[in-house]
């Protein structure tokens, strides 16, 4: 076991604080509409330029083990806030640094760290309650666009695009952000349920120009196993032919004789048909087939539930207004499923999302939820260079997450103003002087984001904060982008409550841990031993030779 170095008390906290300051000072320059860029060196390719706090925090690793512990603890604040709210990472870092700095000073002055922590926790709880009280619910598409614009560092076109996407796919719909191949940023919306399986044979195509198969008002057969011969399927095929409707077969696979027979029937014009493979694999495939069945009011034909192919009747098949099949994707539009059954399935998936511990499973469940609930929107981010596209994509991701958070818990005045007001309204008292000091630490720290936003814009922070606090209106604040004072909610300068709340709670949680630290243990760095020199002299038995 390697030897360890141990630091105690004041020295330990000072080393932690040094690490916290290094990370926070690099991250906080990105805060606000006039936040500065941070350039990050990459081991290959061009350096990355970003204004995204969590991206900067993730890149920082310090040589000194003890300082690095402080930096990593503060990085955890940014990451946790990003996981919960998807934005607010820089605000969380600024708050964390402010609480740690004040807390370490208080402990050095002889105060009880545990009482300080109790005071900090009580103050944070009070502030969060105040934020919820002041929150304004989001109703209109214009308000959604405002939130998106603020989080995208003032890019109005990004805010509008996110608002359009949410309007089209609903708040539950999936909105993904991808890098575009062109210089333009564009929005593409896929309505209905789409899965990544195309037609099994190009002979199923109905539109040769676009190479797609369009089926209007089709029946949909959902089968769990492979189809290799059509004998057992003949009764239902005949019933479909007599109905005069097209048929879509979704099965694990359709192969050999079965596929050949379907193609021949399609080419002869006797049956308008298409076949696709079932989406997903294993248990996920079963769940997705069940989703399709509920969406189209059909049944999954499976021997597990005792249904054999030869016994299938028309009323067991799903229905939809339209199905569009390309080489790679199948889209079912306007399925005939009952609203109540679809909602029950949506709620069931929501419960699974909350219970799962795997990020991969959560992502897949959210995709399923979106496909059932409304559709999928894709924002393709374009730019002149790869560096620009990556920087813009960071901002779009932030804006999207902030917008979702705003729809969930409402909005408050932005620009750090809500926290300034909450600090003024903080009226609780501690049960002893040390707890009172903890409450005052939070009261002072709540000014830090507003001060930092002003500093980044080249303003005098103390003057700006003073002017804001002279006016008692809750939503009165400073618009850094235009340099004017006014009603921030009316001006569209807003922050989602979830983002502000998560930033404060996570910052206080980690800061309290750092303040109450009394010892630190790290490995002693290994000294590199130099390589021994090569032994001198020639090789034996080589005497008499000149070199």
UniProtKB/Swiss-Prot annotation:
Family affiliation: Belongs to the chaperonin (HSP60) family.
Source organism, top-level taxon: Bacteria
Record-level GO BP terms: protein refolding
Pfam families (alphabetical): Cpn60_TCP1
Taxon lineage: Bacteria, Pseudomonadati, Pseudomonadota, Alphaproteobacteria, Hyphomicrobiales
Its job: Together with its co-chaperonin GroES, plays an essential role in assisting protein folding. The GroEL-GroES system forms a nano-cage that allows encapsulation of the non-native substrate proteins and provides a physical environment optimized to promote and accelerate protein folding.
InterPro entries associated with the record: Chaperonin_Cpn60_CS, Cpn60/GroEL, Cpn60/GroEL/TCP-1, GroEL-like_apical_dom_sf, GROEL-like_equatorial_sf, TCP-1-like_intermed_sf
Subunit (UniProt): Forms a cylinder of 14 subunits composed of two heptameric rings stacked back-to-back. Interacts with the co-chaperonin GroES.
UniProt-listed Gene3D superfamilies: GroEL (3.50.7.10), GroEL-like equatorial domain (1.10.560.10), TCP-1-like chaperonin intermediate domain (3.30.260.10)
GO molecular function: ATP binding; ATP-dependent protein folding chaperone; isomerase activity; unfolded protein binding
Keyword field: ATP-binding, Chaperone, Cytoplasm, Isomerase, Nucleotide-binding, Stress response
GO cellular component: cytoplasm
Catalytic activity: ATP + H2O + a folded polypeptide = ADP + phosphate + an unfolded polypeptide
Protein name: Chaperonin GroEL
Subcellular location: Cytoplasm
Alphabetical list of CDD domains matching this protein: GroEL (cd03344)
Annotated EC: 5.6.1.7
Protein residues bound to ATP: 30-33, 51, 87-91, 415, 495
Keyword Isomerase in record: yes
Top EC group: isomerase
